Amino acid sequence: MTNTNRPIRRALVSVFHKEGIEVLAEAFVKAGTEVVSTGSTAKKLAELGVKVTEVSDVTGFPECLDGRVKTLHPYIHAGILADMTNPEHAKQLEEFGIKPFDLVVVNLYPFADTVRSGANEADTIEKIDIGGPSMVRGAAKNHATVAIVTDPADYALVASRVADGTGFSLDERKWLAAKAFAHTAAYDATINEWTAKHWPKPASLDAVEVDKDDQGTEVDPAKFPAQFTRTWDRAHTLRYGENSHQQAALYIDPLNQTGFAHAEQLGGKPMSYNNYVDADAAWRTVWDMAPAIAVAVVKHNNPCGLAIGATAAEAHKKAHACDPMSAYGGVIACNSKVTLEMAESVRPIFTEVIVAPDYEPAALELLQTKKKNLRILEVAEPPKGHEAIRQIDGGLLVQDTDLINAVGDDPDAWKLVAGEAADADTLKDLVFAWRAIRCVKSNAILLAHDQATVGIGMGQVNRVDSCHLAVERANTLADGADRATGAVAASDAFFPFADGAQVLIDAGVKAIVQPGGSIRDEEVIEAAKKAGVTMYLTGTRHFFH
């Protein structure tokens, strides 16, 4: 087998973050490696005992433009890009008096950190690295003879190969190059995400440049750019995915440190994949009810119960009462501070996760000491609207996140089509039910009373079955109580036939809110009129798949 290792005799080092560079310095000194470096990196290496040649001494040209130009010079880039297995490249370097590099170590200006710090536009732009990515890409392209290192986690490996004189094999250099290209791709994607948000197309160009999709439809490039580029940083791997045979990891947005993915865990076992899915769903659900105090109990990405209360404890008791059996092993979310009274209510119930913006000290102590396995999460801010992204085979589907912000979500826009106008209390329940239906998997039917769910039918492939399920849960999960009678109902989409609405009417609901839009709307409305049941049409649908 051919030996493809190339010893490291000459290295170019230019790093913004200096952490861990000591291990490289020690190896360079031990091996007598010739080191070329820039500015503060050169100073740090010299302090560590490395004999360093400044880049400006190689190029014969000083740094200029406030440091914007340091390494952008043929004497540097020819030394990086020369393939020393190519005799012509070697000959040209000799003609120009340029020495090749065997190793390039670079990490980039902290663009994402600068954005997260809230820096102004000018300071943010200064942290867009130019020379660094150029060196990284050049060295990665020329992996035939150059090893490129961008990850400080690889410094120990590099140091050992420098010190023992073996260098890296071709396959190892390819692996390092692949990491480097991933690094610069993520860096550029982060810059692209920031510029797309802050530098939209000006109105002055609307008439001269029209963005169209592959079917000729005009598109708003700010919402759906021609290339969809995003980058997420791996936070940590998870024990497993949705099932034990699936691997999984959590990735976070590098441009902000807020949101559910950045939740602070105050107690309990590590979060699982399913914990994240359910807790995120619960977190979104309770904020649909803001500014009212709300608690949601979620399991398998569906609500077991949701309620509004005068206090967090009251909201939790009402939400739990909807379906106590299903709440076992569920996730609880609260959009206000968890009080000691609420914590005492949660204590006897087996719960996987609780998430809230804050906790009373006594409540937190009780949950931490009496429920040691309970995952306790604190998220400082409500969820933000963002793109909903779903991967399909060979592509992505991207849409706006479904929020309670459509015209039809405003009860003032509802159309009364049957029965008498709802009184104040009934209307409050209808508004609650309509806001709650967004979080229920389609086909979804939800029964509510006193601003709390009392029966939920979700995930059925026909609406009639969802109606039956909602009524059944309302009437069989409450010690024989008939909770459907006098309740209100919400449907996430129209009733295609009158049969589904009739199930609710026969169960005794007094009012129904639904989008309308069926070709048989009149049949559905007539059934409500015949029974004297109030019915409102919203004109807005909330499918959830």
Swiss-Prot record:
GO CC, any one term: cytosol
**PROSITE patterns noted in UniProt:** MGS (PS51855)
Q: What InterPro entries does this protein map onto?
A: AICAR_Tfase_dup_dom_sf, Cytidine_deaminase-like, MGS-like_dom, MGS-like_dom_sf, PurH-like
Gene Ontology terms describing biological process? 'de novo' IMP biosynthetic process
Note the Pfam families from the entry: AICARFT_IMPCHas, MGS
Q: Which family does it belong to?
A: Belongs to the PurH family.
Instruction: Write the protein's name.
Output: Bifunctional purine biosynthesis protein PurH
